[in-house]
């Protein structure tokens, strides 16, 4: 499956929540997409359908393809800790996600573009791999000649989110990935246990 690049609101309506962040269009039409979406009754889903839906929600939320997501799950099963929580922690530790969490980009999709176009550094070195996994203490910054980019300045000026596991220096336009977040520090509405059950079949 290729990475989805279509209308975000349509996907958000599929899951019944604004999984990509603030979405005024979703607020106006928070019912399933389709001709009869506003009047359609949501039938009772099977256990498999619920588990699959949760996996799809996580993949769309973080913008991760199936092979990458499956590999991350396998890595989570080998790590210490609760598999589902470790999976979400791996998602949160990706460079594109941290760039988004720091407020450098208005969305994960925009964060991936910034990383891919070589606007982001890790510990002073250019890194253009969105899936790069950060370690505690890593410093993520905006490349010097990219600090004046309109998308970066506008995103930072509109950002009001604060996360305990990330620090940010507004003057240097760089932040530190202080620690891997605990489950309670991850705001996404994802039931990771359903994903574990699906992959464990």
Swiss-Prot record:
Domain named S4 RNA-binding: residues: 93-153
Region (Disordered): 26-45
Database matches in InterPro entries: Ribosomal_uS4 (IPR022801), Ribosomal_uS4_bac-type (IPR005709), Ribosomal_uS4_N (IPR001912), S4_RNA-bd (IPR002942), S4_RNA-bd_sf (IPR036986)
Superkingdom of the source species: Bacteria
Alphabetized GO MF terms: rRNA binding; structural constituent of ribosome
One Gene Ontology term, aspect cellular component: small ribosomal subunit
GO biological process assignments: ribosomal small subunit biogenesis; translation
UniProt cross-references to Gene3D superfamilies, sorted A to Z: Ribosomal Protein S4 Delta 41, Chain A, domain 1 (1.10.1050.10), RNA-binding S4 domain (3.10.290.10)
Keywords: Ribonucleoprotein, Ribosomal protein, RNA-binding, rRNA-binding
PANTHER family attached to this UniProt entry: 30S 40S RIBOSOMAL PROTEIN (PTHR11831), SMALL RIBOSOMAL SUBUNIT PROTEIN US4M (PTHR11831:SF4)
UniProt subunit comment: Part of the 30S ribosomal subunit. Contacts protein S5. The interaction surface between S4 and S5 is involved in control of translational fidelity.
Primary role: One of the primary rRNA binding proteins, it binds directly to 16S rRNA where it nucleates assembly of the body of the 30S subunit. With S5 and S12 plays an important role in translational accuracy.
Family: Belongs to the universal ribosomal protein uS4 family.
Identification of the protein by name: Small ribosomal subunit protein uS4
Gene that specifies this protein: rpsD
